[in-house]
Design a protein with these regions (language model features):
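Long, intrinsically disordered, low-complexity Ser/Thr/Pro-rich regulatory/activation regions
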Residues: 243-266
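An amphipathic, hydrophobic-aromatic interaction surface with interspersed Lys/Arg
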Residues: 1-79, 148-241
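Hydrophobic, aromatic-lined core segments that form the binding pocket/scaffold
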Residues: 84-187, 191-194
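Intrinsic-disorder/low-complexity coil detector
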Residues: 25, 37, 61, 110, ...
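Intrinsically disordered, low-complexity coil segments
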Residues: 2-10, 114-123, 205, 249-252
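Generic structural motif recognizing short loop/turn segments at the entrances and edges of beta-strands
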Residues: 17, 25, 29-33, 40-42, ...
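General structural signal for secondary-structure boundaries
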Residues: 39, 80, 135, 218, ...
Length: 266
């Protein structure tokens, strides 16, 4: 089995304008395709479970969907990210597509095989209402690269050689899924990833937003705030320990006491 947690990025981090993502600006991946980043309030109105399902679908790679692919008779090691994306967007409805892409209906794209400059065949997506709108593999990488950063969804990549190894991996994932379903039966309400984070943030003295204001905060900014608060608390605890003599400063690295550090490229 070959596993790599860091090779999921489809484009370099240097190509991501993280400041635009942070401020929730529309992301123009080309002249006609624009990504809209939802706010917390929009996610609440849309439905959190629906939102995460949509986000995980759009950010998926073959590894993250290998169980579904395997059950459909497809080996996840033999399908590309782009081919998977082509099959996924065909299943979206208008509401799901418009939540992220506005008037652009992803389900209206159709795959067409064209030849590149070297005569090699490659698939592209053509938008039926306006054939001048097209998505090739490079543009797909840009779209999904932004979405993965925006929603903090970075699926790992796992390859496997041999049918026995693949079947073992699938069986392990199936067991984990069944265990998760059993666990969910005992929960008092629908699972929410955002609820404990929102509750914690609103009750933290360092969080600057009121509940009514939080609805206008974009998802990336909110999740960044959660990470930054955790780093701030850890940094403060370390500094107090250092000043009190309870912690040996020789074992503390400089970035451990810098709560304003870059938390994405470190």
């Amino acid at each position: 089995m070959d596993s790599n947690d860091n090779n999921d990025e489809l484009l370099s981090r240097s190509e991501i304008d993280v400041l635009k993502v942070y401020f929730g600006d529309p992301i123009h991946v080309d002249e006609k395709i624009v990504i809209h980043q939802p706010t917390i309030g929009e996610i609440v109105e849309f439905g959190e479970i629906k939102f995460w399902y949509l986000a995980n679908r759009l950010c998926a790679n073959p590894t993250s969907m290998r169980l579904e692919l395997w059950d459909a008779g497809v080996d996840w090691t033999e399908i590309s990210d782009f081919d998977l994306f082509i099959s996924i967007i065909a299943t979206l409805d208008k509401e799901e597509s418009s939540f992220i892409f506005g008037d652009l209906e992803l389900q209206m794209f159709r795959p067409v095989v064209v030849k590149d400059e070297e005569g090699n065949e490659k698939p592209i997506l053509v938008y039926l209402p306006d054939p001048t709108i097209q998505i090739d593999e490079e543009l797909y990488k840009k779209i999904v690269g932004y979405l993965r950063v925006m929603f903090n969804i970075h699926p790992k990549v796992e390859k496997a050689k041999g049918k026995i190894t693949k079947e073992w991996m699938i069986n392990e994932e199936r067991i984990a899924l069944e265990n998760e379903k059993k666990k969910r039966k005992d929960e008092k309400w629908m699972p929410s990833a955002l609820f404990p984070l929102i509750s914690s943030a609103l009750n933290h003295p360092g969080f600057k937003y009121k509940k009514s204001e939080l609805k206008d905060v974009h998802i990336f900014e909110f999740m960044d705030s959660i990470k930054r608060l955790q780093i701030y608390e850890n940094t403060t605890a370390l500094l107090k320990g250092m000043y009190s003599g309870m912690i040996d400063t020789k074992n503390i690295k400089e970035d451990q006491i810098n709560w304003a550090k870059d938390i994405y490229n470190s």
